[in-house]
Amino acid sequence: MKAKGIAAVIVCAIVCAGGPAAVQVPAARVFAGAPTALWIFPPGATGHEFGVFHFRRVFELDVKPSSFVVHVSADNRYRLFINGEPISSGPQRSDLMHWRYETVDLASHLRAGRNVLAALVWNWGAEKPVAQFSRQTAFLLQANSPREAVVNSGPEWKVLRNDGYAPIPVVGNGVGGYYASPPGEALDARRYPWGWTGLDFTEHGWLAAAAGQGPRASRTQPRASNPFGEAGGWQLVARSIPPMEESPIRFAT
């Protein structure tokens, strides 16, 4: 049977090739210069279990902007869409005291009138890879200036837990040695909210996101009075390496 017309995406990546990545802005300047976003969570979740969550924010613009810069992060991982198009993935892996965020310019994908931001956020839970630090499931989208503040993450965002996903744990005996990567995944496609990144999607059964603390820039916050001198939450630092690429490659006929 011919596989003509079928495309495979090699996911080597963090951000789509040629995507609108902006200059990574130092955290202290970002979080002091704009209305503060809030870390948001799926209500009712413990924040530590395996879970795949969809976040959405519909908003309106009077005109198409020439620039619309935002800063994005999540725990464990996220994939961001604007009007149905993938725009960014991350964050770059690090630890809680140096939690990374990506800076992206959404302007090229925006239009006058209604727009929708959508984020897929997942937490591997107890089966997370050895290199993955985590505080709890969460998502953050921070405006770069007051003009982008309409999309700041907060209770205006909607969220849906995707119950179609389940982890497939991998143990050392099953691979013949030490295993430090994420689990496999099983997906029941009948329970997937197809079309959820687009404007025409109806948010039936979605909930208002629960909101927590605002963002904190690493090394600029007072240290908590605990034996380790650590501040609470995610201490944010700009991405330090270039994003990798995703390249579509077609099967041979």
What residue ranges belong to the model's regions?
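Aromatic-lined ligand-binding clefts that engage carbohydrates, nucleic acids, or primary amines
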Residues: F59-D62, S66-F81, L117-A119, W206
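Extracellular beta-rich ligand/substrate-recognition surface
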Residues: P43-F53, P91-W99
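Short beta-strands within extracellular/lumenal beta-sheet-rich domains
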Residues: E49-L61, R100-L106
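Signal peptide processing junction and immediate N-terminal pro/mature segment
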Residues: G18-Q24
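Positively charged n-region of N-terminal signal peptides that target proteins for export
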Residues: M1-G5
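An acidic-aromatic loop/edge-strand motif
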Residues: Q24-A45, L120-T253
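Beta-strand-rich ligand-recognition modules
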Residues: R79-Q136
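Bacterial N-terminal signal peptides
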Residues: A7-A17
